[in-house]
Amino acid sequence: MIDAEFRSEERFSRLAIAYETKEESKLVNENVDKIIAKYSYKPEIYATKVSNGKEVLVIEYHDDIHRESGAIFEEMIKILDIKECN
């Protein structure tokens, strides 16, 4: 199951997307790459392993003065059919 966590502060926002299987990893990475390619404002992206076998893809926008990342994150959540985002 793919789930997500969102965090935002002044001029900073982060979406962390957690997944378990290779299929989920492929789905997440391909769709995130496709969405990011559509925009000129590029994030920092990194992946990390967490306990219980999950991996997390973290997408961070810094100096997001115009809050462009919100629409980008919403598009990611929608295309990945994430039902719950904390």
Where are these predicted regions, by residue range?
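Short, flexible coil/linker elements and helix-boundary hinge sites characteristic
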Residues: 20, 40, 61, 80-81
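Conserved short beta-strand edge segments in small beta-sheet-based binding/regulatory domains
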Residues: 41-48, 77-86
